[in-house]
């Protein structure tokens, strides 16, 4: 798989650009702040419908405009597929597949399969649980695009249920008991969609675990052994150890956990149980990586998580596109060499670098130089001829 064309309109610092890309390695070179990462971000958005840098879409739209467009042509086994994504201010985002409108942007997920390595990856080890949950969900969505709808529906139900919890004090004051009947309805829906999301994550962690261990050993052979596990906000004993996860059992346990925390939730006005409270646990030896891993160990573990994702996608069938955003600058010589070796099998590798010295020695790659120009509308990124 490779991206043959990337077109941007009013995306971040890019007013207008059309890039013809090729299989093999391409390096986007330019000083920091010139817009290199925005190219990688656009491709990652096309992969997961989300940015790896911000949680909202608004910052992706160029200042002074009301919409951004990302256009890609992806080649997979000789077959071309065109995707256009429109990110809009104040209205629903739109998508087209092979120039035809689709019902939801989620319908284009899976066309581009990519793995992203970025400086933000250190947050997978040292950051909040939300960073690790997003890692799992993004990978699950790339492998099984239907998970995007599951997550979206879970988040919708979670918002509705949280709003209802916050309204309970007022309902009690008015003597309105119907709010509790409504809460039970939302409990059932949260348990249904939450169980499906948790099942997908547990299944993914079970497959990732041996790959993370192998990748970390390659990157840090002198360090302790790496391991991962899934920590849920409810009892998942049994299902987490099974290859065929019982979603009905998970839903029943989630429903029971919601009932057990009902009083605390009503008091605080927040949902205390569900996949939005879960975490991916990372360990080195018998210690949690967060707080105990050195800087080098943390980077090795972060890269190992991405390499494990890459390996799973390869096993699924087809080489995913590798997106390397300034990551070589963050790694020492040994880790650079290990990552470069792993990238050799990819059909396409797209890399950003502030200076060419950040690229591993001996890497044969096309070079695309990025600059910044100014006009009446402000500064914008451009590709140098």
UniProtKB/Swiss-Prot annotation:
Gene Ontology MF, one: single-stranded DNA binding
Pfam families assigned to the protein according to its UniProt record, in alphabetical order: SMC_N
The keyword Heme is annotated on this UniProt entry: no
Keyword Ribonucleoprotein (UniProt): no
Biological processes annotated in GO: DNA replication; DNA synthesis involved in DNA repair; double-strand break repair; SOS response
Binding site for ATP: 30-37
Keywords: ATP-binding, Cytoplasm, DNA damage, DNA repair, DNA replication, DNA-binding, Nucleotide-binding, SOS response
Residue runs in coiled coils: none
GO-annotated cellular components: cytosol; plasma membrane
Subcellular localization: Cytoplasm
Complex formation: Co-immunoprecipitates with DarG in the presence and absence of darT.
PANTHER family associated with the record: DNA REPLICATION AND REPAIR PROTEIN RECF
HAMAP family per record: RecF (MF_00365)
Protein name: DNA replication and repair protein RecF
Organism, scientific name: Mycobacterium tuberculosis (strain ATCC 25618 / H37Rv)
């Amino acid at each position: 798989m490779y991206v043959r064309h990337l077109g941007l309109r009013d995306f971040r610092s890019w007013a207008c650009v059309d890039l013809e890309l090729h299989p093999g390695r391409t390096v986007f070179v330019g000083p920091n702040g010139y817009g290199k990462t925005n190219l990688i971000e656009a491709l990652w958005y096309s992969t997961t419908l989300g940015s790896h840098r911000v949680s909202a879409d608004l910052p992706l739209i160029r200042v002074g405009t009301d919409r951004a467009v990302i256009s890609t042509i992806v080649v997979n086994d000789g077959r071309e597929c065109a995707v256009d994504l429109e990110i809009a201010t104040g209205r629903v985002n739109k998508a087209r597949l092979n120039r035809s409108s689709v019902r939801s942007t989620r319908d284009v997920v899976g066309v581009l399969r990519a793995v992203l390595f970025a400086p933000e990856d250190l947050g997978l080890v040292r950051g909040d649980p939300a960073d690790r949950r997003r890692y799992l969900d993004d990978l699950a969505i790339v492998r099984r695009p239907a998970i995007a709808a599951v997550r979206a529906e879970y988040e919708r139900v979670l918002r509705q249920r949280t709003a209802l919890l916050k309204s309970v004090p007022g309902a009690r004051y008015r003597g309105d008991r119907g709010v509790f009947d409504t809460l039970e309805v939302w409990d059932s829906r949260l348990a249904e969609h939450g169980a499906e999301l948790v099942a997908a994550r547990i299944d993914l962690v079970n497959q990732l675990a041996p790959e993370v261990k192998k990748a970390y050993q390659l990157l840090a052979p002198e360090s302790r052994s790496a391991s991962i596990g899934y920590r849920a906000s409810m009892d998942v004993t049994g299902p987490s150890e099974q290859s065929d996860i019982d979603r009905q059992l998970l839903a029943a346990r989630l429903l029971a956990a919601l009932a057990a925390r009902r009083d605390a939730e009503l008091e605080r006005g927040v949902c205390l149980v569900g996949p939005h409270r879960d975490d991916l646990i990372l360990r080195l030896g018998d210690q949690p990586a967060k707080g105990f891993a050195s800087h080098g160990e943390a980077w090795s573990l972060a890269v190992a998580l991405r390499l494990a994702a890459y390996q799973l996608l390869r096993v699924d069938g087809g080489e995913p596109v590798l997106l390397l955003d300034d990551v070589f600058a963050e790694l020492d010589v040994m880790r650079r060499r290990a990552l470069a070796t792993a990238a050799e099998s990819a059909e396409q590798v797209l890399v950003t670098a502030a200076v060419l010295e950040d690229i591993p020695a001996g890497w044969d790659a096309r070079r695309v130089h990025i600059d910044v120009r100014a006009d009446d509308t402000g500064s914008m990124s451009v590709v140098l001829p």
